[in-house]
Amino acid sequence: MEVLRPQLIRIDGRNYRKNPVQEQTYQHEEDEEDFYQGSMECADEPCDAYEVEQTPQGFRSTLRAPSLLYNLIHLNTSNDCGFQKITLDCQNIYTWKSRHIVGKRGDTRKKIEMETKTSISIPKPGQDGEIVITGQHRNGVISARTRIDVLLDTFRRKQPFTHFLAFFLNEVEVQEGFLRFQEEVLAKCSMDHGVDSSIFQNPKKLHLTIGMLVLLSEEEIQQTCEMLQQCKEEFINDISGGKPLEVEMAGIEYMNDDPGMVDVLYAKVHMKDGSNRLQELVDRVLERFQASGLIVKEWNSVKLHATVMNTLFRKDPNAEGRYNLYTAEGKYIFKERESFDGRNILKSFALLPRLEYNDAISAHCNLCLPGSSDSPASASQVAGITGVSDAYSQSLPGKS
């Protein structure tokens, strides 16, 4: 075959290159059992990530996940273009109407059980407990465990954010300065495309976001609070020297590349003394939560900023990150934004009036609900770290 001129096959208007395949023939067909039996010799390899217990009946592995995730997955029996289509069926974000973890009529669970030669036991809907995987062969149990973990992780990533970690930047003086900024922008630039009062942040909600979380159970919320306390004890106090960190918001910048089509305008946040302590602190908190799996790793460093204008606020004043990308039925929403022309704002307000914030943010890393405006003064103390415990029940599966 000529490598530079391969045979082309046209399918549905697309050209595909047909590459040669060197087929090998064997005297004897391999028995599927041979693969499982051979893998048992590697039972003690250190690369195994899962704990598998050997029992008189074979092998056993367990995993625990929020009961909400047990009820997510439905396998649509249609098969379009050779790809299985996964759909969600739910009543609302936190109360899902479905059968078991792996599919309508148990199709997905049966498929995993058949292909891995295992048996999978799952708690009934609404009940907490462990998923138990048993099988005659260790390799099969590990394979089933891996596939279930992938399914759970995939659907967790698709859930709307329930909480976020942030430092509040809503001191009275800062709110007043922000309102003056808003008034001046509307007075000078309200005729510019897309600029109106609806896209400004609520001054009570000014904050510096560290990361977004999906917490689906009381246990995960408690784990988050405990991890915040560990961060405080292990490095936050050392970085801050046990004293409040004095920061300021000065200057504005936009997220995208075209100042004429802006979706997010933010105020830059930095230490008043010019040090890097705030950046170090938030990066280490982010790193700790990413390592635990509570925050999906998308960035290696936190961008220190406080959003002051966001076009998502036009339709939802409580918009925060990915929070609004899914409906209550779990369907993805394409949110079409109406960008605004930020050129005059950037030119007229290149130096946002310096807004000093002198609160003890080193001791008040907050676990918040999207849309909440609780301040450190009104939020309750959770293990020495400010949290929003009274609102927790509103964010849990099955709670109304």
UniProtKB/Swiss-Prot annotation:
<dbReference type="GO" id="GO:0003723">
    <property type="term" value="F:RNA binding"/>
</dbReference>
<dbReference type="GO" id="GO:0005654">
    <property type="term" value="C:nucleoplasm"/>
</dbReference>
<comment type="function">
    <text>Plays a role in DNA damage repair as component of the ASCC complex. Part of the ASC-1 complex that enhances NF-kappa-B, SRF and AP1 transactivation. In cells responding to gastrin-activated paracrine signals, it is involved in the induction of SERPINB2 expression by gastrin. May also play a role in the development of neuromuscular junction.</text>
</comment>
<dbReference type="Pfam" id="PF10469">
    <property type="entry name" value="AKAP7_NLS"/>
</dbReference>
<keyword id="KW-0523">Neurodegeneration</keyword>
<feature type="region of interest" description="Required for interaction with ASCC3">
    <location>
        <begin position="1"/>
        <end position="53"/>
    </location>
</feature>
<protein>
    <recommendedName>
        <fullName>Activating signal cointegrator 1 complex subunit 1</fullName>
    </recommendedName>
</protein>
<dbReference type="InterPro" id="IPR036612">
    <property type="entry name" value="KH_dom_type_1_sf"/>
</dbReference>
<keyword id="KW-0804">Transcription</keyword>
<dbReference type="GO" id="GO:0016607">
    <property type="term" value="C:nuclear speck"/>
</dbReference>
<dbReference type="InterPro" id="IPR004088">
    <property type="entry name" value="KH_dom_type_1"/>
</dbReference>
<keyword id="KW-0234">DNA repair</keyword>
<dbReference type="GO" id="GO:0005667">
    <property type="term" value="C:transcription regulator complex"/>
</dbReference>
<dbReference type="GO" id="GO:0006307">
    <property type="term" value="P:DNA alkylation repair"/>
</dbReference>
<feature type="domain" description="KH">
    <location>
        <begin position="86"/>
        <end position="148"/>
    </location>
</feature>
<dbReference type="InterPro" id="IPR019510">
    <property type="entry name" value="AKAP7-like_phosphoesterase"/>
</dbReference>
<keyword id="KW-0539">Nucleus</keyword>
<dbReference type="InterPro" id="IPR009210">
    <property type="entry name" value="ASCC1"/>
</dbReference>
<dbReference type="InterPro" id="IPR047538">
    <property type="entry name" value="KH-I_ASCC1"/>
</dbReference>
<keyword id="KW-0805">Transcription regulation</keyword>
<dbReference type="GO" id="GO:1990391">
    <property type="term" value="C:DNA repair complex"/>
</dbReference>
<comment type="subunit">
    <text>Identified in the ASCC complex that contains ASCC1, ASCC2 and ASCC3. Interacts directly with ASCC3. The ASCC complex interacts with ALKBH3. Part of the ASC-1 complex, that contains TRIP4, ASCC1, ASCC2 and ASCC3. Interacts with CSRP1. Interacts with ZCCHC4.</text>
</comment>
<keyword id="KW-0227">DNA damage</keyword>
<dbReference type="Pfam" id="PF00013">
    <property type="entry name" value="KH_1"/>
</dbReference>
<dbReference type="InterPro" id="IPR009097">
    <property type="entry name" value="Cyclic_Pdiesterase"/>
</dbReference>
<dbReference type="GO" id="GO:0005634">
    <property type="term" value="C:nucleus"/>
</dbReference>
<dbReference type="GO" id="GO:0006355">
    <property type="term" value="P:regulation of DNA-templated transcription"/>
</dbReference>
